[in-house]
Amino acid sequence: MVSRQEQFEQVQAVKKSINTASEEVKNQALLAMADHLVAATEEILAANALDMAAAKGKISDVMLDRLYLDADRIEAMARGIREVVALPDPIGEVLETSQLENGLVITKKRVAMGVIGIIYESRPNVTSDAAALTLKSGNAVVLRSGKDAYQTTHAIVTALKKGLETTTIHPNVIQLVEDTSHESSYAMMKAKGYLDLLIPRGGAGLINAVVENAIVPVIETGTGIVHVYVDKDADEDKALSIINNAKTSRPSVCNAMEVLLVHEDKAASILPRLDQMLVAERKEAGLEPIQFRLDSKASQFVSGQAAETQDFDTEFLDYVLAVKVVSSLEEAVAHIESHSTHHSDAIVTENAEAAAYFTDQVDSAAVYVNASTRFTDGGQFGLGCEMGISTQKLHARGPMGLKELTSYKYVVTGDGQIRE
């Protein structure tokens, strides 16, 4: 096993091969990575079977689905890499140019970060997405996956590096930390001078540990306590469609709804319909029904478990939904601001003034009017695959694409000027 220190030194030694690579060279490398990923399907699936067998019974079925790979999912991962090829190269973009009275020309241009570290949990697709985005944005990457997905991740990284071996970019620009202990995560948090940026992707425990302990600059990809508020002026059919999509299309992801707020004028009519759609109809279709966590007002209209205080602060990532009835738009916004992780929140309303108030007052990375929160995604936003959803405000906010993985520098051109 290569030590962490050796890996940090290896990636530092070769980072220039990607930091200054041309768009053509990077695109050729990405295509080679995608081809070798598909070519290694058999090896990746064998590794994934080992991870699945080890994880079964230890994690939820929803989380097992995150871990699971088949040939179609591997092809989708390769397709995601190829889609990055089509994205404009951000490196070298001139952001601003000005000329001073003394003749100096100051150009602000986009440059790579350098080396980006990513700590993430059991999601194999993050490996290929992260490698593609960091490479296209001119960065080397150090990956530290969750223990549950290590065999799969190792097989994926092996395939990606084999692709790079056919190009002029050194394969060591992609590093996988072989040690999956907590100590390896903490070593990355303290790797100042080796990592220019650290991005955690996972649950609240992981993210909080990184934010609280890292001395390397961090972009926080926060958890998603995502709200949908059904206003008194909502179209009920529209609301039900949005709720169904936001909760059931893929409950294990961070842009899935976790809390439903309903105006009291709509509760008596929409909540029984919601119960029929999310419980009765799903049971009839052989699907897992939604388990409600209800406040006292909501429990008057639908059956379910009484909500505990912490249910409104929980990212369930499962077929569980907390429901609260509110008396006004202002109460809904106040609740969101008290419990939100500032990820994605939505209002369903036909009232333009209510929509404007909601979008002005809710301080989240993505705020929706009459649309599902499931759209908070780099691909859906036209950014290609994403590095994560940033819930902070410094440097990056919302889906992080290529530009969010870059910095800038000033190039000052003169003709012998000196400062008097």
From Swiss-Prot:
InterPro entries: Ald_DH/histidinol_DH, Ald_DH_C, Ald_DH_N, Aldehyde_DH_dom, G-glutamylP_reductase_CS, Glu-5-SA_DH, GPR_dom. The keyword NADP applies. GO terms for biological process: L-proline biosynthetic process. It is found in: Cytoplasm. Its EC number is 1.2.1.41. Pfam families: Aldedh (PF00171). Its main location: cytoplasm. It catalyses: L-glutamate 5-semialdehyde + phosphate + NADP(+) = L-glutamyl 5-phosphate + NADPH + H(+). Belongs to the gamma-glutamyl phosphate reductase family. Catalyzes the NADPH-dependent reduction of L-glutamate 5-phosphate into L-glutamate 5-semialdehyde and phosphate. The product spontaneously undergoes cyclization to form 1-pyrroline-5-carboxylate. This is Gamma-glutamyl phosphate reductase. The lineage of its organism: Bacteria, Bacillati, Bacillota, Bacilli, Lactobacillales. The gene is proA.
